A protein has these predicted regions:
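Substrate-binding groove/exosite segments of carbohydrate-active enzymes
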Residues: 235-366
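Acidic/polar, glycine-enriched structural segments that form the non-catalytic walls/loops
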Residues: 1-296
Length: 366
């Protein structure tokens, strides 16, 4: 999704010479991570069920987030849930979730429903602004996909998802129920359980964008990649992911002695930097909030050169810092155009304060 942008019309109560007509933003992605949990007549809802225990943690060393909980449904059914979630650093187009449910006192059917959800709600200034169109969604017996397109810039992204399902650590091959709606696609798969039994679903999602692939090939490419990584399997993929993070920490870790809070803080900053920017594409950059939320639209500010380049310059191969600077250099023609709008000439360059594509996206310059 990095590098995919959307042009949002500038809205101000006054207008000055040089104001940009559009504000670029990185659009919020479709929800590839959704997995619903259903019993015979109930569906997991943490707002309506009793949460007997809950723990969520992030292992920054290995790049894995965990969530553990014990819950009781309104009908008294008790479950223990364990979730592992990664965005793969060794295969950056791949996202994985392992979702495990154990019955404490429940007898009946447990269904897990992995979904690709295109019902996107933005948290930014205009939550009702429609950014994505659904070009096509569909499924086969083993894979589902959601093909999307931004409304103005015609950038496209395709998500493809497949899964493995286990009961008591043994893979099952029961035929799933296909879910095909206008903006959702996926499967429902389940098993009958008694107290002490457990079921596990591993969800493999591959994401392909028009930044790297021909639009006509996005569905084929993402589906093929999802099926390929399923054949490789969770254990191998997660070991690749762990090794990738180990190489990052061996290269960039900062050790602070005697201050555990500062130590955790600096490592969290490093973790978020690498979650946002890998350094292998000079068309990409780092927004002030990384990919932690929608603030600032994911745009690049001057903070990159001030705050991020020094870190990468001192701790990583020179190509990474070089690519960050190449990002600016490649936008020189737009910087000259920006200066011309304000009356400058003879090749004067005004690099933008806020941008994704080289055009100034901020209405007031600092």
């Amino acid at each position: 999704m990095a590098g995919i942008t959307f042009l949002d019309k500038t809205r101000v109560g006054w207008w000055k010479n040089g104001f940009p007509p559009y504000y670029t933003r990185i659009p919020k992605a479709a929800d590839w991570s959704r997995i619903n949990l259903r019993l015979i007549d109930e569906e997991l809802d943490l707002a309506g069920w009793d949460v007997d225990s809950f723990n969520r943690r992030l292992d920054m060393k290995e790049g894995i987030s965990y969530r553990d909980m014990e819950v009781t449904s309104p009908r008294g059914n008790q479950l223990r849930i364990h979730v592992e979630h990664i965005t793969n650093m060794a295969r950056p187009n791949l996202c994985l979730i392992k979702y495990s449910v154990s019955s404490i006192n429940y007898t009946g059917r447990i269904s897990l429903v992995p979904i690709l959800d295109g019902n996107i709600v933005d948290d930014a200034d205009l939550p009702n602004l429609k950014i994505w169109n659904i070009l096509r969604s569909g499924s086969t017996s083993s894979c589902a996909y959601l093909w999307t397109q931004t409304r103005r810039e015609d950038a496209q992204v395709c998500y493809a998802m497949t899964y493995q399902f286990f009961k008591n650590n043994k893979e099952t091959t029961a035929n799933p129920i296909r879910i095909e709606k206008e903006k959702q696609t996926g499967f429902s798969v389940g098993a009958d359980v008694k107290p002490g039994d457990n079921v596990t679903l591993i969800k493999y999602t591959a994401i392909a964008s028009s930044l790297y692939h021909e639009r006509s090939e996005l569905v084929e490419h993402s589906v093929a990649e999802a099926l390929e990584v399923k054949s490789i399997g969770w254990n191998t993929l997660i070991e690749e992911h762990r090794r990738a993070w180990q190489e990052i920490w061996d290269e960039t870790d900062v050790v602070i002695e005697g201050d555990p809070e500062a130590q955790q803080g600096i490592r969290y900053n490093i973790f978020q930097l690498y979650q946002t920017y890998r350094g292998d594409d000079p068309r990409l950059n780092i927004g002030p909030k990384g990919f932690t939320g929608e603030k600032y639209g994911g745009n690049t500010y001057w903070n990159t050169e001030l705050c991020c380049v020094p870190f990468f310059l001192l701790s990583t191969p020179k190509e990474i810092a070089k690519n960050l600077l190449a990002y600016r250099h490649n936008q020189l023609p737009k910087a000259i155009e920006n200066a011309r709008k304000l009356g400058f000439k003879d090749g004067a360059a005004l690099f933008p304060q806020v941008t994704n594509n080289g055009e100034e996206c901020h209405s007031e310059w600092e």
